[in-house]
Amino acid sequence: MKPLVLLVALLLWPSSVPAYPSITVTPDEEQNLNHYIQVLENLVRSVPSGEPGREKKSNSPKHVYSIASKGSKFKELVTHGDASTENDVLTNPISEETTTFPTGGFTPEIGKKKHTESTPFWSIKPNNVSIVLHAEEPYIENEEPEPEPEPAAKQTEAPRMLPVVTESSTSPYVTSYKSPVTTLDKSTGIGISTESEDVPQLSGETAIEKPEEFGKHPESWNNDDILKKILDINSQVQQALLSDTSNPAYREDIEASKDHLKRSLALAAAAEHKLKTMYKSQLLPVGRTSNKIDDIETVINMLCNSRSKLYEYLDIKCVPPEMREKAATVFNTLKNMCRSRRVTALLKVY
């Protein structure tokens, strides 16, 4: 009720003010004043009241003050104080319209020598009075649903399968490669897959170095070269392990290199064991003493078993480069034997 009483007192206040010299009001200012009076009436009607029927009384035609009468009363309103040089903004809470009108710049009438400064009553701010105005319709804020976060893209990586080294039943040094190996190069992102094979092999790519392919010229690699290559790979692996073993980016490559090294060592041991077995056999009686009959049987059996490929074996172009010197010695010996009369006579018997 206090805000309503204050507003009514403000409306009735100009009648109790003593008469001061009148001022000249322009039509625009008069229109702004009339609009402001209408805004005040709307504010008075929008103030909630505890008494029922209060709003009906304010809307009744018996209202004493009209817009025109209040507009005429504001023409004679003059108050002492500092003049406001800025424009005031009125906001209607119902229609949400904004009206700007000048509050200063009143020109006194011609013929008045005294200059009086006037301040409109609506520019006076009370010190200890607080007015709470409520709109007829409450403001409802629509809560917008928050956008759902996009699911994080899952990074897919090629599966990594470790090789399996199994011992053969015939020899403890021979390894068979049963499961495929799939490695992922971190720098290039290319997966390297090796299909399953039962035959021991030395070809393949490691995560540290891409060695030369052994499958192209297997006869050009002897036992010493293979062991030297394995030692080089082992030294490189040891250097890689000493450099950085805690980095998870290199851990998988190091494990793959270890597996390849184990396979290479096992294959080298199997090859060495096979060579030792061949040296002990009768096919290659090198470095051991034997009787004459055993040597004859060995040579005849070897020539008989390879008789279908003697033409290929006797061609110098098919012999590996490191064995051409020995092959030339054998070929010259055979030529000399074929030219001798003794061998020709012996061959005629057969």
Curated annotation (Swiss-Prot):
Its main location: cytoplasm. Residues 1-19 form the signal peptide. GO terms for biological process: acrosome reaction; fertilization; fusion of sperm to egg plasma membrane involved in single fertilization; sperm-egg recognition. Glycans are attached at N128. Glycosylated. In testis there are two predominant forms of 77- and 67-kDa and a form of 47-kDa, whereas in epididymal sperm from caput, corpus, and cauda there are two forms of 47- and 43-kDa. Testis forms contain complex carbohydrate residues. Epididymal sperm forms are N-glycosylated. Then undergoes significant glycosylation in the testis and that the majority of these glycoconjugates are removed by the time sperm reach the caput epididymis. Keywords: Cytoplasmic vesicle, Developmental protein, Glycoprotein, Signal. It holds the Pfam family SPESP1. Highly expressed in testis, where it is localized in the acrosome of postmeiotic stages of spermiogenesis (round and elongating spermatids and in ejaculated spermatozoa) (at protein level). Poorly expressed in placenta and fetal lung. GO terms for cellular component: acrosomal vesicle; intercellular bridge; microtubule cytoskeleton; mitotic spindle. It comes from the Eukaryota. It is found in: Cytoplasmic vesicle, Secretory vesicle, Acrosome. PANTHER family: SPERM EQUATORIAL SEGMENT PROTEIN 1 (PTHR31667:SF2). Involved in fertilization ability of sperm. Belongs to the SPESP1 family. This is Sperm equatorial segment protein 1. The lineage of its organism: Eukaryota, Metazoa, Chordata, Craniata, Vertebrata. The gene is SPESP1.
